[in-house]
Amino acid sequence: MKFKSTVIAASVLAGIMSLSAGAYAMGGASGAHVNYPTTGKIGAVMMNPYGIAPLTAVIRNGGYSLSDISVRIVPKDGGQEITYTVSDAKARTHGGIPIFGLYAGYRNTVEVSYTKTTEGKSERVEKEVYRIYAGPANIATAGYAGVTSVFPVAEVKKVDPAFSDRLYLINNMIAATPNTTRAVWNNPMGGALEWNRYPQNAIYDTKGEIRWYMEPSKIYDPNNIYMAGIMMGFRQNNDGAFTWGYGQRYVKYDLMGREIFNRQLPDGYADFSHAMDPMQNGNYLVRVASADHARPDGKHVRTVRDVIIEVDQNGTVVDEWALWDILDPYRNNVLKALDQGAVCLNIDATKAGQTITAEQLAELDKTDNFGDIVGAGAGRNWAHVNSVDYDPTDDSIIISSRHQSALIKIGRDKQVKWIMGSPEGWGPKFADKVLKPVDKDGKPIKCEGSKCEGDFDWTWTQHTGWRVDSKSDKDVFYLSVFDNGDARGMEQPALPEMKYSRAVVYKIDQKKMTVEQIWEYGKERGHAWYSPVTSLTEYYQDKNSVDRKSVV
């Protein structure tokens, strides 16, 4: 108590001294100077400048033009160093030197080098040191018994030296809380509005330390249906900024948390999830659904995960792919084999291992039961598109349809170019579009139904069917995909422990309409590596590596 009294007295005394000296009173104008405290040769440090990235800061320019900027976040003992340069444009945009990669709950040491210029005079500053404390990582948590930390705690098993500079964005969410999943659509019914979870997004270094996280309260509100949803589809664009979507929004922010755009979906569409892909032409492919679809039986419904739109940088919808008009929404081969206990993020352990029959699907289609449920026809989850990519060589899109267990290439003319999936049930319209498996010598592989000889296998309830741009051309298409493995072979196994997942890369000869499996990983890991939902596989050219993230 005595210490606190001393501090208060000193504060009051300082205020009296300032007033007696003729300075402006606290709260008044500062005059021809800036009275923020500074520790270096430029301006003050502003923490979390845009309100959503607490482990960022800006060292303000202090009225100078800054150039030739470099930044080093000094690592903890045994920690991972983060270094980067800052363009003049970025320094102007942020009003100073952007700082990224601070440790949470720690007094960071940051070294910056720069040239400052004013009135034609320049000064070079090398390795100026700032001590910047960032508070502990903290966002909302769920009150469930199993929750023991704000963010997942990373357990680092092994780090190859060649990958020690990596940073990993973890796109996560907390389990459904009582203030989420409380609303459904009306006028018309259907859709997937109840897909709403509190976001938990962070960047980890290779030591398992959080170096960035999102504090989402400025952009996410579980009580506002147009500001809620599940944040998914994070992609880093060529300009370094991130795009993603959630619920009724698609957005773009830079790493500092600066909003580039945050838009509500165009009014004819609803329920973003999974995929927002930046195209080479500057537009975006966004996986949505229809907000009002008139079915052949006259019923109006909101559809579920079966529409892709192309939007330009101004938000104009320049094209759409309505999949019920392109594919067969009543192909039910995979639907009948799905494990009803784990349909993407809709987990119901009481239905584990259960399947649905053709008769049940037919009866369901006669009812008014629409929405995020497995079923045939528009208005139910017949397609479940969980990724979309673009091929600039022929102006086509590639979709991953979980509930058709197929990767499908579709042209701008809305015609199917090829289907990478088991051939059952596609009918005469699409039979010649199904790719033929071949071995490394180009010889056909014998397949009966959904089972093929040797190591070749199709993908089952897969995710992230992405074009490997650095290896593909107009004739040869390299496809990376995460094969989740549910309903493998169009059936449920005798024991759930027989299920497994794979990261796979295929080589498709688009002229010969053949597919070769050139790499896989995961089958040898068995059920321990099985991921019934979500997950991804992506090739990285810089280290000739494949990144695999899964939910196990």
Task: Kindly give the residue locations of the regions a language model identified.
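Gram-negative bacterial Sec-dependent N-terminal signal peptides
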Residues: 1-24
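Histidine-/acidic-rich catalytic cores in large beta-rich domains
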Residues: 26-76, 92-96, 100-552
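Low-complexity "stalk/linker" and mucin-like segments enriched in Ser/Thr/Pro/Ala/Gly
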Residues: 78-86
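Short beta-strand segments within Ig-like beta-sandwich modules, predominantly Fibronectin type-III
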Residues: 86-92
